[in-house]
Amino acid sequence: MVFFKDLFIFKSLIKGSLYSGHMKKKLLNYLPLFALMLFTVSMMAQTAPDEDTNSSIACPSSGVFQNNTTRDVDIANPDNVGTVDDRTCYADYYETSVYGETWGAYNITFNSNHWDAPNTLQPRIERSLSRSQETGVGSYARFTGTLRILEVGNTGTFGSTGSYLMQAKGKHTGGGGSNDPAICLYLARPVYGPDANGNQVQVSFDIWREQINFRGGSGAAGRTEVFLRNVLKDEIIDIELEVGFRQDPNDPNLKIHYSDAIIGGQVFNWNIPEPERGRESGIRYGVYRVKGGRAQMRWANTTYQKVEVVDNSTIPAADIYRIKNVETGEYLTSSGSSIIASTSGTGSDKEWEIISAGSGSSYVNIDSQVRGIIRFTGGSSNPGLVSTNFSPPNTDTDKVWTVIDNNDGTVSFETRNLGRFLYHDTNNMITHSANIDDRSKWNLESTTLSVDSQQIASVGVYPNPTVDGFTISLDNISAEKVQIFNLLGMLVYEQKTNESSIHIDNMDNFDSGMYIISVTANDNKVYQTKLIVN
């Protein structure tokens, strides 16, 4: 902190009572020398008053920090907000009092993760914060705090050097990546300079944003690093990170999923790719990753706030289906790269989204909740299906399907416009075939519709199927809004109401096919049922 003290004295000389024309002239004469002195002092490493200077980075042989039964290892009434995730046997979270503040201390060392199998994942002491689990415009998670970086990991290789200070988190639809993927991580890499004895030590840190290129992205192909700024060792830095959803200024019908950071007064905003796939917004902070040496960071003045706004622009979760074959009663299932049939409809590997293949496209992608979209291969001689890692929307000609409504409550999926259909064959293989029978027909079971039959029973529609019009009855629901969506999730009807029933006789927006009626109540609960238009 010598640098900041000297800078304060210099400013006092310029602005204080000693300031005069004569003094100004003398100061200007010495300014280059003084500036050099400041630069030299600033780059000369100072040991922070609460820095861990232990020469050993090994976990204590006593096992005092092993904590084999829990990762939530905390002190009573911690000053820092959030729940601890402690995966290091080197140290536990503790607090120090320096510079007039209470600081949470986060220290980890190379090979100190004893939890994850061991050392398959990097050591960390982080704090997790409850996530904003809605995706409507105005939903966000916001963290603020004050940070001092004292040391970060170093391997001598650029890519593996550095430690993370915070990260934006958030799950997404359509599969791909880990079960709890990072959206972007904020990484500190060391800059070296001399200490008082001339030894090369960490004197400052370059801050980088490691951002995904696509949902679930990891590694060199899946992420990009962007340099943000440099901060000095032990410099007191104000931090703000907000992750959430805002309206796209270029299209009011679209939204942006963002991760906006302010680091030491400098703004670094970033829009997350594939915002329509985002399901939540979360934040973790502390210290994470050390592939060589030790990492230690100090956090103070931490706060957290979240806002959750329901997204009513599309069917809430109703566009996630179990796809059941009419002939066999078995469910379409993603099993690794294969598509198989299962007698059970339980599990996310039987859950699918039917998503438009692109703006203006009449085709759809069939997207697994645990993997990616279905690709069809071969023709009549060697037909096959592959569960890919590709995400929707995708217009590749071997990954697009036409949804055909059979006007009996079932649908068929045609491979593009090739006259071949998703098919459960007699050999129990899921394939595509030119045969048109009940093995090419499928029931779409909405995961929302099948969860709570008591909710569904309170929404009625008659006549159903219909041709000329229909009535929606709302039994025991204090309704606020009625919406009707087609199978692609497009809104075709919306009406605010406080009545117990609605009659619709204008069918101009209703082509033949299946629809989902979604009723939002005053308490924000959503009730849904199916409608078939002939």
Swiss-Prot record:
Sequence segments annotated as region (Ulvan-binding domain): 316-449
Pro-sequence residue ranges: 450-534
GO molecular function, one term: lyase activity
Active site: 169, 288
Protein residues bound to substrate: 164, 218-223, 288-291
Binding residues annotated for Ca(2+), in chain numbering: 63, 68, 86, 88, 91-92
pH dependence: Optimum pH is 9.
Localization of this protein: Secreted
Domain remarks: The ulvan-binding domain binds strongly to ulvan, it does not bind other polymers like alginate, heparin, dextran sulfate or iota carrageenan. Presumably it serves to anchor the enzyme at the substrate, thus improving catalysis. Notably, the catalytic domain alone is more active than the full-length enzyme with the binding domain attached. Possibly, the ulvan-binding domain helps the enzyme to act on ulvan in its insoluble form embedded in the algal cell wall.
NCBIfam families recorded: Por_Secre_tail
Protein name, UniProt field: Ulvan lyase NLR42
